[in-house]
Amino acid sequence: MTEKDLVIYRRRLPHWRLDGSVYFVTWRLAPNQADLYAGERNELMSALKHFEGHRYELFAGVVMHDHVHVLVKPLGNQPLQAIIHSWKSFTAHKFRRDYGRTPPIWQDEYLDRIVRDEQEFLDKAQYVLNNPLKTWPELEDYPWVWVKEDLTP
């Protein structure tokens, strides 16, 4: 990696971009929003998987009651921010139309981190898989978590 390969920009939060990287990304519902309904979680999981293998490689994802975590690698010339924008925009419009939610649905910003090595990649995938158990320890099966079978960065 050279300095010219790494792009850093800032909105309210800093964002680092490095071509070919895997990112761990988190975004949340806006503060005025009630928890996601089961149908909304289904829609969001479907949206996350929709362009998998075309615009991005999705390694893991979980839709919680008020936030989302994904482990994702943009493909080709797809910018990470465009991928996240498409997920948030598509689901916000769908949630407004189908569930009567009023905007804003999602917080404007999101947290992203470049995954630096294979161990961190595996740790983040495990975090995604275990995230529902942190909130609901008695849970045996959570339908809104997904981890790719061939989990290699």
Task: Place the predicted regions along the sequence by residue.
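Short catalytic/metal-binding and nucleic-acid-binding patches
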Residues: M1-P153
